[in-house]
Every structure is written in structure tokens, then in C-alpha cells.
Amino acid sequence: MNDDRQALTEDVLALLCSIAPEVDPAVIEHARPLRRQVDLDSMDWLNFLVGLNERFGVEIPESDYARLVSLGDVLDYLQAKLEQR
């Protein structure tokens, strides 16, 4: 993993832990559905997506929410959006 991807991963996991403090980031698998791994309800998930927007300045349209299933999906999405700047 390159340094930019590692930093992005750490930032995303820190945000996730701020919303769900019981989450152990060391056990999050990149390919499994994130909401199931950390048992986020719909409000927590929405707070997570809003937090991504605020932290990274990336607009996430509601139509894209369904694409953001796993941690890997979230990271790929953010990385692509950040590279478009």
C-alpha cells in the first residue's frame, strides 16, 4: 500500500472510530461489507458519509451511497475523487 493510500485508510478509520468508538480498526477487512462488520445503523452510516464529505471535501451524491459497501469501496471512491481535483 502506498503512503497516500495508507494515510487515507488511517483517516477513514479514525473517522469511523469517532462515530462508533467500539470499533477496533485492526479487525476491519477491506473487502467485507463495512456496516455489517461494525454494526452501524442507518443514522451512523449517514453520519459517516457526511463526515467523509467534511473531512475530505468530497461531495458524495446520494446516488453513490450504494457503491460504498466495503472499506475498500470507500477508499477507492475517495481516492478517485481526490485525484480528480
Regions found by a protein language model. Name each.
Residues 2-40, 44-50, 54-85:
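Phosphopantetheine-dependent thiolation modules in NRPS/PKS and related acyl-activating systems
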